Swiss-Prot record:
It comes from Rattus norvegicus (Rat). Belongs to the peptidase S1 family. This is Trypsin V-B. The lineage of its organism: Eukaryota, Metazoa, Chordata, Craniata, Vertebrata. Residues 16-24 form a propeptide. It catalyses: Preferential cleavage: Arg-|-Xaa, Lys-|-Xaa.
Length: 246
């Protein structure tokens, strides 16, 4: 799920996480099998969100993806078939950022502790946290099992999208008075390529580091409305302190 904000799906003030949100890859391509080994699927009876494996026992996702009963599925490519590389591990703890605001979608970040450590291998591995914040023009990889077109069913296999980080000025112009210092935009102003429903919580990886979390947007792949992502670099202390304390 990706957050829909009304007025105009992602309008002026209110943000509502719904199961018909806007977060799956539109205009991307099928990822090479197991080429995104840090990608996880959050399952609450079915796939609801993505996430990133950052240690063998911790997953990074979006706060709006919270569900009281989550199973983390690692090593997935086709989420509707058992292919042999999967590891299904229940969540032991889900820790939302204490300042998460569901109305503004600020601080849209959550840590999930697995009940048991994942077995790391070529098909299940971790992604490093960033050393620096992303800069405009940086090419990044977004991945997920979100819908290929807004309102349609999700794909069975993992989708990828290569997209650039946009400048703060472009981001603020696209979403006046909605972008906080904890958000950044990524994508194409001409539309046609974007994350969408059920990509939420998934990774944005730039230069081998997880720089973003799929968070919200106005529809999917609309002209002038790029995707908005949680800026992971702002949360390094919180992540490190939370992991150490739990």
């Amino acid at each position: 799920m990706k957050i829909c904000i009304f007025f105009t799906l992602l309008g002026t003030v209110a943000a509502f996480p719904t199961e018909d949100n806007d977060d799956r890859i539109v205009g991307g391509y099928t990822c090479q099998e197991h080429s995104v080994p840090y990608q996880v699927s959050l399952n609450a009876g079915s796939h609801i969100c993505g996430g990133s494996l950052i240690t063998d026992q911790w997953v990074l996702s979006a706060a709006h993806c919270y569900h009281p009963q989550l199973q983390v599925r690692l090593g997935e490519h086709n989420i509707y078939e058992i292919e042999g590389a999967e590891q299904f591990i229940d969540a032991a703890k889900m820790i939302l950022h204490p300042d998460y605001d569901k109305w503004t979608v600020d601080n849209d970040i959550m840590l999930i502790k697995l009940k048991s450590p994942a077995t790391l291998n070529s098909k299940v591995s971790t992604i490093p946290l960033p050393q620096y914040c992303p800069t405009a023009g940086t090419e990044c990889l977004v991945s997920g099992w979100g819908v290929l077109k807004f309102g349609f069913e999700s794909p069975s296999v993992l989708q990828c999208l290569d997209a650039p980080v946009l400048s703060d000025s472009v981001c603020h112009k696209a979403y006046p008075r909605q972008i906080t210092n904890n958000m950044f935009c990524l994508g194409f102003l001409e539309g046609g390529k974007d994350s969408c429903q059920y990509d939420s919580g998934g990774p944005v990886v730039c230069n081998g580091e997880v720089q973003g979390i799929v968070s919200w947007g106005d529809g999917c792949a609309l002209e002038g409305k790029p995707g908005v992502y949680t800026k992971v670099c702002n949360y390094l202390n919180w992540i490190q302190q939370t992991v150490a304390a739990n």
